[in-house]
Curated annotation (Swiss-Prot):
Keywords for the protein's UniProt record, in alphabetical order: CF(0), Hydrogen ion transport, Ion transport, Lipid-binding, Membrane, Mitochondrion, Transmembrane, Transmembrane helix, Transport
Gene: ATP9
Main function: Mitochondrial membrane ATP synthase (F(1)F(0) ATP synthase or Complex V) produces ATP from ADP in the presence of a proton gradient across the membrane which is generated by electron transport complexes of the respiratory chain. F-type ATPases consist of two structural domains, F(1) - containing the extramembraneous catalytic core and F(0) - containing the membrane proton channel, linked together by a central stalk and a peripheral stalk. During catalysis, ATP synthesis in the catalytic domain of F(1) is coupled via a rotary mechanism of the central stalk subunits to proton translocation.
UniProt-recorded name of the protein: ATP synthase subunit 9, mitochondrial
Membrane topology: Multi-pass membrane protein
PANTHER family xref list: ATP SYNTHASE LIPID-BINDING PROTEIN, MITOCHONDRIAL (PTHR10031), ATPASE PROTEIN 9 (PTHR10031:SF0)
A single cellular component GO annotation: proton-transporting two-sector ATPase complex, proton-transporting domain
One GO process term, biological-process aspect: proton motive force-driven ATP synthesis
Main location: mitochondrion
Length: 76
């Protein structure tokens, strides 16, 4: 029984590593937005929706990893 509990905790810890990738992805998206806006300020209205879409996709990846972690801890 203790081995199964340890495996749950290890699996949950490993699955939360994906949230690190989501954080890095969000940082890259907004760094590119700031870089593009500083190079050409007139493109702000064009670049911003793409940045929000990239943010949403990166955040969804992190939320899926967090959901897997909670499922391993409390659902199985």
């Amino acid at each position: 029984m203790q081995l199964v509990l340890a495996a749950k905790y290890i699996g949950a810890a490993i699955s939360t590593i994906g949230t690190l990738g989501a954080g890095i992805g969000i940082a890259i998206v907004f760094a590119a937005l700031i870089n593009g806006t500083s190079r050409n300020p007139s493109l702000r209205n064009t670049l911003f929706p793409f940045a929000i879409t990239g943010f949403a996709l990166s955040e969804a990846t992190g939320l899926f990893c967090l959901m897997v972690s909670f499922t391993l801890l409390y659902g199985v």
